[in-house]
Amino acid sequence: MSASPPLVVITGPSGVGKDTILDLLREDLSNVYVPVTATTRKPRLSEIDGVDQLFYDNEGFDSLIKNNSLIEWAEVYGERYGVPKSQIEDARSLGKELIVRTDVQGAFSIKEYDPSSVLIFISPPSLESLSHRLEFRGGITVDQIQSRLSAAELEMEKADLFDYVVVNETDNLEGTINVLKDILIDLGFSLKNN
């Protein structure tokens, strides 16, 4: 039996399509597990605690930090997010192939935790296209869009520190998924038999 593939970290600016990409990749990968992150933000209407996120109040999240239960955590847009160690350790003990979705700083923290991890940065084709995506997605103000674009610019400056950079071209999601599948297959991830 071959060695299990490395932990893969996928990150990129807000609005670049990380969640959509991960949802589509999960359809094609047979043994993948995407850890559920802990957060202090309130659940969205359709979200389920323990499935979409692990929802904590501030006191509960503080306890996770105090007990060193998170691989990494950060405050993002006024809410805290983190990756529980138990999510990684439990999945590994079951032989799962891991893809973690986090922010740029979290990616570097995970690399410190697991130096063999592989970091993939999902980039928009341009800041202008990212702005259009954020506007189309809705639910955030013009000021919030500007804040996210400023953060995206700083994040994109760090893209060359990643093992792979994949551009999520507008109107070519299938192409993005195919590039990522090729990377994951090369790393040893298992595809479903279709």
Which ranges hold each PLM region?
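Hydrophobic anchor at the beta1->P-loop junction of P-loop NTPases
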Residues: I10
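P-loop (Walker A) phosphate-binding loop of NTP-binding proteins
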Residues: P13
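ATP-binding Walker
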Residues: V16
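Walker A/P-loop
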Residues: D19
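Post-Walker A helix-loop "phosphate-sensing" segment adjacent to the P-loop in P-loop NTPases
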Residues: E27-P35
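ATP-dependent small-molecule kinase phosphotransfer cores
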Residues: T39-L98, Q105
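Conserved phosphate-donor/acceptor-positioning beta-strand/loop module used by diverse small-molecule
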Residues: L98-D103, E112-F136
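NTP-dependent small-molecule kinase module
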Residues: F136-I140, L154-N194
